[in-house]
């Protein structure tokens, strides 16, 4: 039973940036289809900067815990420069306390362990998107 509910303005689409291998993109798209989320897929870290330059706005960024070389820091930097900054979900084969606390310290939202079920992915994306909306709403009221 899917209990994920997005609490966002019905006039605004929920957008997700997903840095995932090409062979997994179809599965992610299917797992998120019932949420009505618009997903922009990239398969290489360098492609994230191209999207950032276009000033695309995302509720959530789905990033792998491991990237070759220093790609992870570069991607994190690009994501951090997006305004507003999306909530970052990091996926990994295992979630250690060190990884989870490191992600939170860097300003990420959460870590999800793969392989994840449709329900697990939907729940994580929903919570992150709702957190994004709440944070942006608070920021708007603080101005």
Residue ranges of model-derived segments:
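Conserved phosphotransfer microenvironments
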Residues: 25, 49, 58-85, 92
């Amino acid at each position: 039973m899917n209990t994920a509910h997005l609490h966002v303005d019905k006039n605004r689409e929920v957008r997700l940036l997903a840095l995932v291998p090409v062979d997994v993109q179809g599965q992610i798209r299917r797992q998120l289809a019932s949420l009505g989320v618009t997903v922009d897929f990239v398969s290489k870290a360098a492609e994230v900067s191209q999207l950032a330059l276009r000033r695309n706005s995302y509720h959530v960024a789905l990033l792998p815990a491991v990237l070759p070389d220093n790609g992870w820091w570069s991607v994190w930097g690009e994501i951090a420069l997006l305004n507003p900054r999306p909530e970052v979900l990091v996926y990994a084969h295992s979630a250690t306390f060190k990884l989870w606390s490191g992600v939170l310290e860097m300003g990420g939202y959460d870590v999800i362990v793969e392989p994840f079920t449709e329900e697990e992915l939907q729940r994580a994306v929903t919570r992150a998107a709702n957190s994004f909306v709440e944070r942006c709403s608070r920021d708007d009221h603080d101005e």
